[in-house]
Amino acid sequence: VNYALTIKKVKMSAMFLAHRKFIRISLRSRGDVDVNLFARRYFNGGGHKNAAGGKSFLTMQETIDHYVRSVREFAEEGRLG
């Protein structure tokens, strides 16, 4: 999950892991991007400012679609820097 942050303009990364009954989402960020807030708001999770996680009980595709919509909303609020 940290590897994507080595790319210069990437400020937030995510990894989705399928478990038997849910999808676990791991989030990382750098700078002022607060993935703790993101995880709490969109994935019933939490953590720290630059490292957080959550869960989804949707399918993998539905979870990814929800993530993409959520990132867009988060960006529109000016929270991606």
Give the predicted meaning of each segment.
Residues 1-81:
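Gly/His-enriched, cation/cofactor- and phosphate-binding structural elements
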